[in-house]
Amino acid sequence: MSCQAFSADSFTTLAGDSLPLLMHHASAADCLPSSASTHTHNMVSAVPSGLSLLQSSKRSHMHLSTSTLGNALSNGPPGLHYPVTPCHYSNQQTTYGMMAAQEMLSASISQTRILQTCSVPHPNMVNGANTLQGSLAPCLYKFPEHGLGGGSCSLSHSFPPLPPAVLSEEPPLGGTKDLRLRSRPPDDPPDMDSPQIRELEKFANDFKLRRIKLGYTQTNVGEALAAVHGSEFSQTTICRFENLQLSFKNACTLKAILAKWLDEAEQAGALFNEKMGMNERKRKRRTTISLGAKEALERSFGEKIKPSSQEIVRMAEGLHLEKEVVRVWFCNRRQREKRVKTSLHHSSYLTKDSPTYR
């Protein structure tokens, strides 16, 4: 509220039921109407007792009670009714003990009017305060909260303590665990003469021999494993494993996978061979005919090139051979005789057509 000096010509006549205009002047007598001068004089007489109490206490924090002023004003004329609200300032350092009685009365009335004005906030101020509160929400420290009640006005400062996570200098438990895992040195590979290395070399050699026996190539194994375990398996991976060019950890991991695949491949190969053996026609073993039996069959072939079925049976019984063996021999002998006759006829034809030179 700004204070301005007015001349006597600037004042207008007020109605009787209107409130008096409160201005900041040198004294309360300049701003109060004449009808309240007597009432003010009676009210000031009660103030020195309170001043003596304040001067004797000599405290830095002052407690100003205006209950006496409120009672005095409540008994005044109806046109001069100023509701006085007691105020408590916890951080007030100014002492009003040395102020004059009239200036003290003017200051108390002015403060009462200001507090009444501040008790009803403007809508724009409320909206602005809400916006400011929303923008300052992420801050660690909150601004001081000012509470204005209906019967008292108190100013207090509240600063929430910092979170324990901010004040603590120790890393969280999760971070300590991760740090411990990261700082752990990697496992050293075993020596070249260790049992693990020898067992790995033996398995690599056995795997190569059994793979070749089953008829699989390194590419076939890589494609079969890639279809099940992913694209990290290829012909290069199998080749490096058989040549022991992988790291010990990767070789051990691949060993378990290859051992499982090898067992499945052998089982599948055994089943396949069994089915093929059942479906395949058995080939008869080759029959060996003695020289005496061949001479007897040659004589019979000279007599009759194509014997009957009964004659074949009698010859088979006489030579102690099977009927089918005798029949096949006569078929093969006729085919050979036919080839010999064809070749002789062709050679004689070439001899007749060729010219003779003398």
From Swiss-Prot:
The ranges of region (Disordered) come to 164-195
Compositional bias ranges of the Basic and acidic residues kind: 177-187
The POU-specific domain is annotated at: 192-266
Q: Keyword annotations for this protein?
A: Activator, DNA-binding, Homeobox, Nucleus, Transcription, Transcription regulation
Tell me which residues form the DNA-binding region: 282-341
Task: Give one GO biological process term.
Answer: positive regulation of gene expression
GO CC terms for this protein?
nucleus
Role of this protein: Transcription factor that activates growth hormone and prolactin genes. Specifically binds to the consensus sequence 5'-TAAAT-3'.
Question: What name goes with this protein?
Answer: Pituitary-specific positive transcription factor 1
Q: Which organism is it from?
A: Oncorhynchus mykiss (Rainbow trout)
Gene encoding this chain? pou1f1
